[in-house]
């Protein structure tokens, strides 16, 4: 619509949802260590193999610790202070390589917490050993690191990923920087691989978005960016990941100590990117005047902080509401023709 004259603006909007996430610290837990007493979120690396008889019991008890309290009120729960990844070594060479980073790794299942600060071996009849390991790691006094991770679906098997890292301490005169190592695990919550009981793994590892050293200056944010393409990566059988489903992808990222003077390589912080549940109707018919486009959004681990939208290459605009949102789209601001509408949901 131009100068008040009613014309058709066809909104062939691309249903492209950008999900941006940062780690939030939410109170409330029935585990031994209250969530508010955690110094950082804890990562568990579950080393497993599809032929391993005792691995399913380990996986299920890890999952009991992770899954939402609202759905499973009798299970322990750490809100968003604990995440784990299943590193299935007989189907993924990078998972097998990661096992080689631990000199004391001897068999399956083995779960390393925070890069080896705690280790639990063997099948498990309950969650107690995992809870104790998580509590011990979560209470560890350590370097103050802020960490965020974002992911956006670019269509098909292409995922844009950004990591934001800040060292929140003053550097010393002799050592003004901090050396770390970042691993961003791309996982499928419902894995394409089945365990010995013929059930899908929880958070089965596919590949790293980032797997590299990082040098931090005091109080300065470092931003890493990449575009991960599933078809460019394969498992041990030579099968690529071009068939990924964005709704079945999470990214868990951990920043590890890599200082030469340090006696350990423990994880200092962990964050996550999980696509939200979004119900939104992307219009395909002709729009005019000011169009009201509504939807809902929810996240299994945190609350929704904001909903933003933009048209084509314009600026991001804030929608009204969060869990229930309303986009007031002024079609008079755009020329006649097809346009691209993008949503960005942040926790």
Predicted regions and their residues:
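Local sequence-structure signature of Cys/Sec-based thiol-disulfide redox active-site neighborhoods
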Residues: 33-72
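Conserved beta-strand and immediately adjacent loop positions that scaffold enzyme active sites
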Residues: 43, 110, 181-183, 252, ...
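Secretory targeting signatures
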Residues: 1-35, 52, 295
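Boundary/junction segments of secreted and surface-exposed precursor proteins
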Residues: 22-43, 279-290
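Short, conserved sequence motifs used for protein processing/export or organelle targeting and
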Residues: 39, 76-279
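Long, low-complexity serine/threonine/glycine- and acidic-rich segments characteristic of extracellular
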Residues: 276-347
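Short helix-capping segments at alpha-helix termini
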Residues: 72-77, 338
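Short, well-ordered amphipathic alpha-helices
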Residues: 29, 62-67, 226-229
């Amino acid at each position: 619509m131009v100068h008040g004259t009613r014309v058709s603006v066809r909104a062939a909007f691309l249903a492209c949802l950008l999900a941006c996430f940062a780690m939030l610290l939410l109170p409330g837990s029935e585990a031994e260590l209250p969530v508010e007493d955690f110094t950082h979120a804890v990562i568990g690396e579950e080393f497993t193999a599809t032929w391993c008889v005792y691995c399913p019991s380990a996986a299920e008890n890890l999952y009991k610790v992770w899954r939402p309290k609202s759905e499973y009120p009798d299970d322990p729960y750490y809100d968003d202070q604990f995440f784990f990844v299943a590193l299935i070594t007989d189907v993924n060479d990078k998972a097998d390589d990661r096992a080689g980073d631990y000199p004391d790794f001897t068999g399956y299942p083995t779960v390393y917490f925070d890069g080896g600060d705690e280790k639990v071996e063997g099948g498990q009849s309950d969650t107690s050993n995992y809870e104790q390991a998580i509590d011990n790691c979560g209470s560890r006094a350590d370097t103050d690191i802020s960490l965020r991770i974002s992911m956006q679906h670019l269509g098909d098997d292409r995922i844009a990923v950004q990591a934001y890292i800040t060292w929140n301490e003053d550097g010393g005169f002799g050592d003004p920087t901090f050396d770390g190592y970042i691993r961003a695990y791309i996982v499928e919550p419902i894995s394409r691989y089945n365990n010995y009981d013929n059930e899908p793994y929880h958070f089965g590892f596919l590949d790293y978005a980032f797997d590299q050293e990082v040098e931090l200056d005091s109080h300065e944010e470092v931003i890493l960016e990449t575009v991960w393409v599933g078809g460019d990566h394969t498992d041990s059988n030579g099968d690529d990941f071009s068939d990924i489903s964005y709704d079945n992808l999470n990214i868990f990222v951990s920043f590890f100590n890599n200082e030469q003077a340090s006696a350990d390589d423990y994880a200092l912080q962990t964050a996550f990117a999980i696509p939200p549940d979004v119900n939104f109707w992307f219009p395909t018919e002709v729009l005019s005047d000011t169009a009201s486009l509504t939807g809902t959004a929810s996240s299994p681990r945190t609350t929704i902080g904001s909903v933003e939208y933009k048209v084509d290459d314009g600026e991001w605009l804030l929608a009204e509401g969060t869990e229930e949102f309303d986009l007031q789209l002024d079609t008079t601001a755009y020329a006649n023709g097809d346009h691209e509408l993008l949503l960005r949901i942040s926790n």
